[in-house]
Swiss-Prot record:
Organism taxonomic ancestry: Eukaryota, Viridiplantae, Streptophyta, Embryophyta, Tracheophyta
Subcellular location per the Swiss-Prot or TrEMBL entry: Cytoplasm; Nucleus; Cytoplasm, Cytoskeleton, Phragmoplast
Residues that bind ATP: G117, Q118, T119, S120, S121, G122, K123, T124
Biased composition (Polar residues): 630-640
Biased composition (Basic residues): 613-623
Modification Phosphothreonine, positions: T145, T675, T690
SUPFAM superfamilies in alphabetical order: P-loop containing nucleoside triphosphate hydrolases
One Pfam family here: Kinesin
Similarity comment: family membership: Belongs to the TRAFAC class myosin-kinesin ATPase superfamily. Kinesin family. KIN-7 subfamily.
Kinesin motor domain segment(s): 30-353
Organism listed in the record: Nicotiana tabacum
Post-translational modification note: Phosphorylated at Thr-145, Thr-675 and Thr-690 by CDKAs and CDKBs. The phosphorylation occurs before metaphase and inhibits the interaction with NPK1 preventing the transition to cytokinesis.
Further facts: Expression of a truncated protein lacking the motor domain causes inhibition of phragmoplast expansion and multinucleate cells.
Name the record gives this protein: Kinesin-like protein NACK1
Length: 959
């Protein structure tokens, strides 16, 4: 009789593990079952035993009895996921049978690999090879995944005579307790867990576990395993620090080498070996019972996991949260046919067991806190700066709703007007007094009609009163649409006037900016004049030898006197420049006030005005924003365009004019005593009064939105121009100080002395040739580089200066200024030593320790930029080039600390500057210019303006 069982579908084996965050959902898949048939061993060959089992293909194994036994035992076949014959190697068993299951532990899915079979069938031999191959693949995957950080922990235990023993700690005792954990399941108390540092360390720990296992000799096997061995690898992987992901994968990989089932009649066991065999068979019988009940598919019945410590420890691997692979090993000998057949029956049932594998993710407390802090910061930023698109959409929806409401009310009013007109035309006749009564009856909102008796008893005066009130209500209903149209035209006129006033306000600001612009031209002309005189002084030709010494001295004194006069003028203009800066600040504040005064809360203002009107109906507005009486005041505000006070007044006036117009002047046409009472005509008057109030609010919002867009554009243009003026003022201040330094140098040279009696000392300053300038440039730049290193100057500043000034003759002035600044800084640091100077106001203190700390923070900043500005390949290339170990820790800081460390190596300096420039990005887009860079090279002194350019690098580090 041939028995064929279906194999597990390949789609359920080869499918990549699905990512299921937090482990809430998994996917069902069946246990992968493979069968390995070993060749006949020496004992079986010596006993002239023959092979009774044969693998006919990769999925089927068949029983072939000897001819004399075919009648009693017919041939039978079994089909599994994979079948390996006697010639197969362990590597093939691993690659084609259990590799996918083993490597799924790297993705956060628990995995278990069993070796099941009778004694002497090759279980331990197979599991050793499987474990070795799995370790190789695990570490190969770790090396190919540098973006994740892996940590592997190993523990080993054996179950010997139903006692749990720790294989990594022989002193732990013979029996460890099993505890139930609500999250981890069944755990072994006091089980040692070692962390593997590398693959060699892991193999060493596995070999220790194998050496500590109980092994004995039987009639079937010289080295028979007398206990169940479980080696568990706990693999945890986390993304590196550069990622924002806070979840980690945690999974366990179990290598289970079961002891073989045996018959006492075949093993000839007695005493201790017999007792060991009994415990082995009992635990394997419990495992078979669990597999049989799980294969039925009905989970409602009791599954005896707790009947054996083996099934209790491996409960998750049997129908739980894990992927499981079972390797059943067989002996082909005909003397073991019954044991082999029982093994195949066990494998057939195991094929039908379904597991529910899930991805196990955990979040560490430290990573969770960092993630939550970032999330809180992001949410706070969103609250501080709401999405303009959403706010704009909300406003559009509000306006659309108001427009629809106004349209509905307009249609209602129009229908009422048409109805009134039609009734009036129908009732027109020879007696006008008779035509009033029907209209009044239609217009007045009575809850019912008067009875005939009450009509007869009503006096004539009440009849006349009702007729009069009816005519008034009719006139108000007719006048409401025309009033609405009149108010719309009035609002359009107000919109035009408000636009004109806004244009006038912006013209005033532009005139004020132009006034400041003309004010600093005198200082610029004076500085240009001084520069021309200095160039003229340097270009004086050599005087003839017969020129008298007195004339030369007179010329030098006259030049010095002229320069001193110009310096005095510049100092006198210092207050002018300060006033100019103050005026520019006032203009900036005026612009900010103008932006803040733009209408943004119109709805609230309109509601406040309406509420105030309702509380005080008889109170009139004394100051209307756009009436002719205020035109004279507005002209007075525009008289002084250059005064900051006038600018502030103009901004305040614009703020008053941008308010919503009071609705008291709109409602004055309808007298309070003419309005019908609520009982008579209140419904009609309330319906007629709502549309034009809402229409005025909508038109005012439209008008203010148009004005706001135009005003914001003009304010942005003026603000950019004011910023440019501030930069020019700072540049003029710097040039003035530079000229002062040059004059002081000339006086020092004159005092230090020219020996005017010797003709050789009266000579012209020779014009430097390109060759001599290049030599001077290299010497000065090398001095600057040395001083940079001594004074712990910012390496970003070094790189920017080094790459910007490359030997052009126009660079002479910048090198001179930098050399002076560094010389002063060196002297200043030498005088201070390790002391820290006292802080004066808000000015930064410069000391040796503060410079070192600033340089350290700057290097940390550049190390962080490595991951964002460079690719992984570029970083590895630089690590190799700068001799930074690729496997070392803190590679980025090691690399950054090597930059700008050798000032005497020109190649090192150039490469360091290029790397820093690439990390900071100031060379991108050509944004380096001498005009802006000169503000960073000002000499320090006790005056505040000298520190104008010292904060550039610190500002960059706080981006």
């Amino acid at each position: 009789m041939t028995v064929r069982t279906p194999g597990t579908p390949a789609s359920k084996i080869d499918k990549t593990p699905a990512t299921t965050p937090n482990g809430h959902r998994g996917r069902e898949e069946k246990i992968v079952v493979t069968v390995r048939l070993r060749p006949l061993n020496k004992r079986e060959l010596s006993a002239k035993d023959h092979a009774a089992w044969e693998c006919i293909d990769d999925h089927t194994i068949i029983y072939r009895p000897v001819p004399q036994e075919r009648a009693a035992q017919p041939a039978s076949s079994f089909t599994f996921d994979k079948v390996f014959g006697p010639d197969s190697i362990t590597e093939a068993v691993y690659e084609e049978g259990v590799k996918n299951v083993a490597l799924s532990s790297l993705m956060g899915i628990n995995a278990t690999i069993f070796a099941y079979g009778q004694t002497s069938s090759g279980k331990t031999y197979t599991m050793r090879g499987i474990t070795e191959k799995a370790v190789n693949d695990i570490y190969a995957h770790i090396m190919s995944t540098p973006e994740r950080e892996f940590r592997i922990r190993i523990s080993g235990l054996e179950i010997y005579n139903e006692n749990v023993r720790d294989l990594l700690n022989s002193e732990s005792g013979r029996s460890l307790k099993l505890l139930d954990d609500p999250e981890k399941g069944t755990v072994v108390e006091k089980l040692v867990e070692e962390t593997a540092s590398n693959d060699q360390h892991l193999r060493h720990l596995i070999s220790i576990c194998e050496a500590q296992r109980q092994v004995g000799e039987t009639a079937l096997n010289d080295t028979s395993s007398r206990s169940h061995q479980i080696i568990r690898l706990t693999i945890e992987s986390t993304l590196r620090e550069s990622s924002d992901c806070v979840r980690s994968y945690v999974a366990s990989l179990n290598f289970v080498d079961l002891a073989g089932s045996e018959r006492a009649s075949q093993t000839n066991a007695d005493g201790a070996r017999l007792r060991e065999g009994c415990h082995i068979n009992l635990s394997l019988m419990t495992l078979t019972t669990v597999i049989r009940k799980l294969s039925v598919g009905k989970r409602s019945g009791h599954i005896p996991y707790r009947d054996s410590k083996l099934t209790r420890i491996l409960q998750h691997s049997l129908g739980g949260n894990a992927r499981t692979a079972i390797i059943c090993t067989l002996s082909p000998a005909s003397s073991h046919v019954e044991q082999s057949r029982n093994t195949l029956y066990f494998a057939t049932r195991a094929k039908e067991v379904t597991n529910n594998a899930q991805v196990n993710m955990v979040v560490s407390d430290k990573q969770l806190v960092k993630h939550l802090q970032k999330e809180v910061a992001r949410l706070e930023a969103e609250l501080r700066t709401p999405d303009p698109a959403n706010e704009k959409d909300w406003k559009i929806q509000q306006m659309e709703m108001e427009i629809e409401e106004l349209k509905r009310q307009r249609d209602l009013a129009q229908s009422q007007v048409d109805e009134l007109r039609r009734k009036l035309q129908e009732e027109q006749g020879p007696k006008p007094s008779e035509s009033v009564s029907p209209v009044v009856k239609k217009c007045l909102s009575f809850s019912g009609t008067l009875s005939p008796n009450l009509e007869e008893k009503a006096p004539v005066r009440s009849e006349r009163t009702r007729n009069t009130m009816g005519r008034q209500s009719m006139r108000q209903s007719l006048a409401a649409p025309f009033t609405l149209m009149h108010e719309i035209r009035k609002l359009e006129h107000l919109q035009e006037q408000l636009g004109d006033e806004a244009n006038r306000a912006l013209e005033v600001l532009q005139k004020e900016v132009a006034c400041h612009r003309l004010g600093n031209q005198d200082a610029a002309e004076t500085i240009a004049k001084l520069q021309a005189e200095i160039r003229e002084m340097r270009s004086i030709r050599p005087l003839p030898k017969e020129v008298e010494v007195g004339s030369v001295v007179a010329v030098n004194k006259s030049v010095s006197a002229n320069l001193k006069e110009e310096i005095a003028r510049l100092h006198s203009q210092g207050s002018t420049i300060a006033d100019l800066e103050e005026q520019l600040e006032n203009v900036q504040k005026s612009l900010d006030k103008l932006v803040m005064s733009l209408p943004s809360n119109n709805d609230q203002q309109s509601n406040n005005d309406t509420t105030q009107k309702a509380k005080h109906p008889s109170k009139k507005k004394k100051l209307l924003p756009l009436t002719s009486s205020n035109s004279i005041n507005r002209q007075n505000f525009l008289k002084s365009p250059c005064s900051p006070l006038s600018t502030a007044r103009q901004v305040l006036d614009c703020e008053v004019e941008n308010r919503a117009p009071d609705s008291d002047d709109l409602s004055c046409e309808i007298q309070p005593d003419e309005t019908p009472t609520k009982s008579d005509g209140g419904d009609v008057s309330s319906k007629e009064g709502t549309p034009y109030r809402r229409s005025s609010s909508v038109n005012m919002r439209k008008m203010q939105k148009m004005f706001q867009e135009a005003a914001e554009e003009n304010v942005r243009n003026i603000r950019s121009y004011v910023t440019e003026l501030k930069e020019r003022v700072a540049k003029l201040q710097y040039q003035k100080q530079l000229l002062v330094c040059q004059v002081l140098e000339l006086e020092a040279n004159e005092a230090a002395g020219y020996n005017l009696e010797d003709d050789e000392n009266i000579h012209q300053i020779p014009e430097e040739s390109p060759v001599s300038w290049q030599i001077t440039f290299k010497e000065q730049r090398q001095q600057i580089i040395d001083l940079w290193d001594v004074c712990y100057v910012s390496i970003i500043h070094r790189s920017q200066f080094y790459l910007l000034f490359k030997g052009d003759p126009a660079d002479e002035i910048y090198l001179e200024v930098e050399l002076r600044r560094l010389t002063w800084l060196q002297q200043h640091l030498a005088e201070l030593g390790n002391a820290t100077p006292a802080r004066v106001g808000n000015e930064p203190t410069v000391s040796l320790s503060s410079s070192i700390r600033a340089l350290k923070r700057e290097r940390e900043f550049l190390a962080k930029r490595l991951t964002t500005r460079l690719t992984a390949e570029e970083r590895d290339y630089l690590y190799i080039k700068w001799e930074v170990p690729l496997e070392g820790k803190q590679r980025r800081m090691q690399f950054i600390n090597k930059l700008w460390t050798n000032p005497h190596d020109a190649k090192h300096v150039h490469e360091s500057a290029e790397i820093v420039a690439k990390l900071v990005g100031f060379c991108e887009g050509g944004n380096m210019s001498r005009e802006m860079f000169e503000l960073n090279f000002v000499l320090p002194s006790d005056r505040r303006p000298w520190f104008a350019g010292w904060n550039q690098i610190s500002d960059l580090l706080h981006i």
